[in-house]
Amino acid sequence: MTIVNEGAENVGYFTPAQKIPAGAAIGVPQTKLFTPLKIRGVEFHNRMFVSPMCTYSADQEGHLTDFHLVHLGAMGMRGPGLVMVEATAVSPEGRISPNDSGLWMESQMKPLRRIVEFAHSQNQKIGIQLAHAGRKASTTAPYRGYTVATEAQGGWENDVYGPNEDRWDENHAQPHKLTEKQYDELVDKFVVAAKRAVEIGFDVIEIHGAHGYLISSTVSPATNDRNDKYGGTFEKRILFPMEVVHSVRKAIPDSMPLFYRVTATDWLPKGQGWEIEDTVALAARLRDGGVDLIDVSSGGNHKDQRIEVKDCYQVPFAEKIKDQVNGILLGAVGMIRDGLTANEILESGKADVTFVAREFLRNPSLVLDSANQLGENVAWPVQYDYAVKGHRKLR
C-alpha cells in the first residue's frame, strides 16, 4: 500500500490537503452552530464567523503585510465558518489611520491574494469588508494614543470628508463637507474595490455601514443636516448606501454573497439619531437591493452615545430585524464569548450566524472549545489533529 501525503490544490507551495475543513462537523451536526449554511454559491461549514477587526498594521500605502497573513491565516486554520478581513478603504482618504488596509490601487491586491490563497489552501472561506472612514479618518492607531494623525505622521488631516463639517470630537480632524459629485465618485470607488476583491478570489464582500464611518454618518439625522439629494428625509439619507449596494451587487458575480454591516442604533435619546426602527426599514431595502446578510452592530456615530454594554447586548437588535423583515439573513455580534451562548442565539431564532471578534484574539481555538462545549465532533487541521483526539482517520 502506497501512502501519499496529498497536497492542497491551486496553491504555489506544498501544504497538506484539508479534505474536511477545520471546524466542520464530522457526521450529522447536532447543533445549529455547526450546521452548514449556504448563501448563494458559497457554503459555510459552521456559523461562527470572525468579525473584521482593525489592526492598524498595514504599511502607509495600504498594503497588508506578513503580519496579516499570519494573523488571519492562523485564525482561519482553527475553523471558523468565515474570516473577514478588516475594514479596507476604497480610497486613500477613506482609511481610519495611516496603517489601514486599502484596495484603491492594483499593488494592494498582491498581499491580499496571498492571504486568500492561504485560506483556500486550508479549505476555509474568507471575505473582505470595504469601507470609507468619512469624518473619522486620519487618526492614529488607538494603541498609540487616539488622536489626529498629522501629515508628519503619515496622516491627511486636511483631506478628511463627511456629510457635513462637524467633527466627531476633539481627537478627530475637521472634515470638509462632501459634494454630491464626490459622493457619486465614491460609489464608483466601492465598485472598483469590489471588482478587485472578486479578482483576488474573496468568497464574500461586506460593505461597512456602521460605527460612524461615512455611510453610517450619512444615514443618521444626528450627523447629516444636508438639504441636497443625500440629506433630509430618510429616503435621501439612505440614498448613498443604496447606490453603493446596487452598484456593487451588479459588479460582482450572482454566486457571491454580499453582506452589509449596520449600526442598529446611535444610542442617543429617542428622536435624536438613527434608531432600530430606521434599521428595520433599511433592512428591507437592503434585501431588495441584493444584500444577503446584515451584520448587526451599533453605536460609534456620535460622541454623546450612551451604550449599555453587556454580554450579547446587540443581539436583540438582530432579533428585532429578523422578526420584522423576511428574506434576509441576520448576523449577531458583540460580546459573544462562547459556543453555548452562540448556539443559543441561533437555536432560538434570534440570528442566523454569529460574528465573534475579541474572543478569537483571546482564544484562537474558540471553535474547537465551542464544539467540545456542545458535544460536537469537528475536524481539525491534519497537522494538529493528534493534539486533539489522537491520529484520527478522518480523511
From Swiss-Prot:
Amino acids binding FMN: 208, 358
Q: Which reaction does it catalyse?
A: A + NADPH + H(+) = AH2 + NADP(+)
Tagged with keyword Cell wall biogenesis/degradation: no
What are its E.C. numbers?
A: 1.6.99.1
UniProt family annotation = Belongs to the NADH:flavin oxidoreductase/NADH oxidase family.
**Record's keyword terms, sorted:** Flavoprotein, FMN, NADP, Oxidoreductase
Question: Is Oxidoreductase given among the entry's keywords?
Answer: yes
GO cellular component terms, A-Z: cytosol; nucleus
Q: How is this protein organized at the quaternary level?
A: Homodimer or heterodimer.
The coenzyme or cofactor needed here is: FMN
Q: Which GO terms describe its molecular function?
A: FMN binding; NADP binding; NADPH dehydrogenase activity
Q: What is this protein called?
A: Putative NADPH dehydrogenase C23G7.10c
Sites binding substrate sit at 208, 386
